[in-house]
């Protein structure tokens, strides 16, 4: 979202990603729905930009096993989509350099599971 619609953290996130050059960006395939819908209120151009951006990011499909893992993740306040993103991140194991996120519940849950987290500001 922050790479599609300008928010206070957008420039910091862009700098962070440039500095991390050479590392692959990956996300859950659910971002194919989540991101365009999140920016839809900003108009068709934002939706098109989101779709184009997602085409440059690796996406891991949500298998039934992954969804079951997400259902079992705590804490209880973790929202469903965030649980899927977190389960997706866990699938990368030691290859995961960092989970970049700005949702407090998601980043706290990731930290509790021992995942590296960044929220560039």
Where are the model-predicted features located?
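Short, well-structured N-terminal submotif of metal-dependent ribonuclease cores
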Residues: 1-27, 39-51, 55, 121
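Phosphate- and divalent-cation-binding pockets in alpha/beta enzyme and binding domains
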Residues: 12, 34, 69, 108-109
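Acidic, PIN/NYN-like endoribonuclease modules and their adjacent C-terminal/linker elements
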Residues: 27-28, 32, 41, 60, ...
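Residue-level recognition of oxygen-bearing side chains
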Residues: 9, 65, 105
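Acidic catalytic patch
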Residues: 55-76, 82-88
């Amino acid at each position: 979202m922050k790479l599609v619609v300008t928010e206070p953290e957008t420039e910091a996130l862009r700098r962070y990603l440039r500095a991390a050059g050479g590392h692959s960006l990956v996300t859950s395939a659910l971002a194919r729905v989540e991101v365009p819908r999140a920016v839809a209120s900003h108009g068709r151009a934002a939706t098109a930009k989101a779709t184009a951006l997602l085409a440059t990011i690796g996406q891991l499909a949500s298998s039934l096993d992954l969804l079951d893992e997400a259902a079992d993740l705590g804490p209880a306040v973790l929202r469903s989509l965030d649980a899927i993103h977190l389960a997706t991140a866990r699938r990368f194991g030691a290859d995961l350099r960092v989970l970049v996120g700005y949702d407090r519940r998601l980043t706290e849950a990731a930290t509790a599971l021992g995942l590296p987290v960044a929220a560039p500001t």
